[in-house]
Amino acid sequence: MTRILVLFHSWTGSAYRLAEGVAAGAREVDGCEVELKQVPEVVSDAVLKRAGALEPRKEFAQVPVATIDELPSYHGFAFGTPTRFGCMSSTMRSFLDQTGHFYAEGKLIGRVGTVFCSTGSGGGM
């Protein structure tokens, strides 16, 4: 069985809804076991509240949070993030930055990956 991880970060729910679609499509492939997870949030609740993100995040609060150590158990990845000033979110970046030791150890060699993003407004709003 091929294990696929659809991993996302979202504040407003847009990247979450995209992740649901990616996961649904991947589940249509015979022989694939697909898991949908979110990255651990690194931004404080105070900042999330000021940004208006606490309420929208309730939509996907039930989605399990991924850990770095589980990544080598998957055969493929789809990473989803909103854009922040043209870049991935700092939360997704923080998660991925913690995977360097897997590269050094060769633990993710041969894995397949893709990315998707949501974006919607200018000026970082």
Can you annotate each of these PLM segments?
Residues 109-125:
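Short, glycine-/small-residue-rich phosphate/pyrophosphate-handling segment
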Residues 1-107:
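N-terminal beta1-alpha1-beta2 submodule of the flavodoxin-like/Rossmannoid cofactor-binding fold
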